[in-house]
Amino acid sequence: MIDRGALMSRYSRASDPDIRSVFHREFEGNQKRSEDFYRRIFLEYGDESIAELVTAQVGIQNVSNVISKVIEEIRIGLSYLEKSTRYVAYDRKVDGHYLFMQAEKIGLSGEAAREYTDLCNRLFDLYSSTLPRIEEEISRQWPIESFDFNIDGNPRNYKELDENGRKLAQKSYRSSVRSRALDDARFILPASTLTNMGVSGNGRSFIHLIQKLMEYGVPESERLAHDLYEELKGEFPQIIDDALSQHGQDIINYKRSLASLFPYTDGGRFEKVRLIKYSNEREEMQKVLALLMYPFAEDASGIISRIKAMELSEASAILERIRDLRKNRRMKVGRPFEAVNYVFEVTTNYGAFRDLQRHRFLSIVRKPLTVSYGFDVPPIIAKMPDLSEEYAEAMKDAERVYRIIKERYGAWIAQYAVPFAYRYPVVFTTNLAEATYFIELRSTPQAHFDLRDIAIRMYNEIKSVHPSLAGIIKFVDTGDYPLGRLSAEVRKNVKAGGI
């Protein structure tokens, strides 16, 4: 892989217009030349951009849901796929163990290790017994006969379908019930739950990832940083060395010093979604219109003068025409709308935060996971008295174990004991283009109900301060869908050819 990067970097400095000629003349059959080239340009001259010309794909197995979120904080240069708690059940043991990070691997011993292990086993036992009970309750509350199915372009009630239609409807319904049960049951899983990740990216970003894992400073993250370093040395040896060089260690120490500037405290009052920073709508509209017109008109100052002279109704009419041009949510609003910025504070549960974080244009600032803000109860479990009591007891036990671990090992290690149900406040900056994409995508029926709630609340917050600009968010869906994946499952099965 390193020879390809060296070739592209050398090509950027060559007068020869044919990259093949450069390869044949300078690199073909000469691996040492490409390594020497990288050593000279990257290490001696400090040209870090050439580290973006080599790429690798890495599988990371059995990483906790504490550290997987640290990994996914690197938002530029790395792409991720992660095992989903929405579609994959965690009710089976592997080699006699549930899939959570073992106590010794996170640095626990003695009483804290026993309490932690007992808690995780209890949570996984409850999760495993809860899944079928939730499925049964969903089927009782929303039987298949209560739904219409659009199989041939003509929505009909289940009772009106022919035999083949009923078979397809039953298959779609079972998958939807299972998905909804997994959505509710995942609240029980602890942050120590293991996941698998596929990571694809360039050398420069892998350097940043290794340094971030070292900076985080818990046993799992430091162990993973060294494992990644050793694995990637075979792919781009001259580049990855920079991650843990003296220069790299200076960066790690600097980030750790920043993190220690303020003592860790928790507490406060948090709303589900709160817009905490925005600008005057008229000024923001003028900015958007100026950027929309810039490719087709005079200099920026001339455009701005013209727009300032516009009546508000004229400016609104232009935005309305853009709205009318959008026929579906995949027709994105465009870069000029990125100039409108917002800062939100969102308090959701840790399970939903994991989905929120995948939107890389949300610049998230977050805290360690804690039990201090209480926990959410998923809707189906809340309607089942016996199960909701078991659930609440398990959450209280998690709080007790968290405090035991925190007292001895600190807040960062104690995160592993916290279930996904616990509330997790974060702040993020975004812009109108990304907010439009997020709101329209995450308000679709098949989105997780917590993400739908966040998306709809964000829309309402934006609409309350920027009513004209909010009109561009055309495809927000505020409907109520007890089985949100049902229509998507029907479409999938119809496309697959039925049964």
From Swiss-Prot:
Domain ThyX intervals: 1-246, 271-476
InterPro entries in the record: Thymidylate_synthase_ThyX (IPR003669), Thymidylate_synthase_ThyX_sf (IPR036098)
Official protein name in the record: UPF0159 protein Ta1429
Superkingdom of the source species: Archaea
Organism encoding this protein: Thermoplasma acidophilum (strain ATCC 25905 / DSM 1728 / JCM 9062 / NBRC 15155 / AMRC-C165)
Key words, A-Z: Repeat
Matches recorded under CDD domains: ThyX
GO MF annotations in UniProt: flavin adenine dinucleotide binding; NADPH binding; thymidylate synthase (FAD) activity; thymidylate synthase activity
Family membership noted in the UniProt record: Belongs to the UPF0159 family.
